[in-house]
Amino acid sequence: MIAILRLSLLVIAMGIVLGGLAAPLWHSMVTLPTYTVGSDGAATTTEKGLTQVFSTDATYCLIGLVVGLIIGCLSWVLMRRRGAWGVLAAGISACLSALACWWVGVLIGPDSFAERIASAKSGEVIPIDFALHTWVAVLVWLLAAMVPMLIASLLAARRGASRTGRAKTSTGA
């Protein structure tokens, strides 16, 4: 049981580190939309700017897909003989990795859009806050981590059945 706990903590720690390292990548891949302050003090953006708001979420999901697959593969390699514990460790690791990426990305900034726009002068261009706009994007990381676990366990089960020369048959009535 101690070995399972150690391996689980290792997988979880690796996930958190991967999430923290993914945040600067996420930040560098996103072009934040901007608002331009007019002479009357009103802030406006373009139609393209409105659609770019969701590029932050889409890029986060794309990075989560890659990091989740890495976490799932690492979890399988380290915990393939541990059964459901490996799946649980991969799931927790992926969720914490996603949250670490989100947290570090928001810390990198920018933030305080309302304050920045309020103190802006006419003609200034102010980027929106760097933020994730939906928590559902975190689930991409979790699902991506489960895919390698499911595929590898399916292939391992088939390999095991072919080695014994027996295929499991269902008994029908």
Feature names for model-found ranges:
Residues 52-67, 124-147:
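Hydrophobic alpha-helical transmembrane segments
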Residues 2, 6-14, 59-63, 85-89, ...:
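Alpha-helical transmembrane segments of integral membrane proteins
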Residues 34-53, 118-122:
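Perimembrane loop-to-helix junctions flanking transmembrane segments
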Residues 20-39, 106-112:
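Membrane-helix exit/juxtamembrane interface segments
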Residues 106-126:
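Interfacial non-cytosolic loop connecting adjacent transmembrane helices
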Residues 65-75, 93-96, 100:
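Alpha-helical transmembrane segments within multi-pass membrane transporters and channels
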Residues 11-27, 88-106:
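Hydrophobic alpha-helical membrane-insertion segments
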Residues 1-8, 31-32, 70-90, 106-113, ...:
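Cytoplasmic membrane-interface segments at the C-terminal ends of transmembrane helices
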